[in-house]
Amino acid sequence: MKDKKLSRVAFDFYYASYDKLIEKEELGWTGWDNKCWKGTFLGDIKRLLKCELNQKNLVNIANYCMFLWNFEEEAKDGH
């Protein structure tokens, strides 16, 4: 029973994350290779950590952390 519930939560999280990425693209997001987003992501994470931690905010934090992680990986690769 726990495995099914965990699987469902992971599935819901995946789709919520995907929907957030699509929403950002529609608002002009050009991809995580655009360095101008780095400061915005850091600010958004700090702002969201002060808010109620609901599902939407956790998805947003996870997405912003993913973008920041990608910046670090690209820097290691010399991009």
Range-by-range predicted roles:
Residues 1-79:
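Flexible "arm" and connector segments at domain edges
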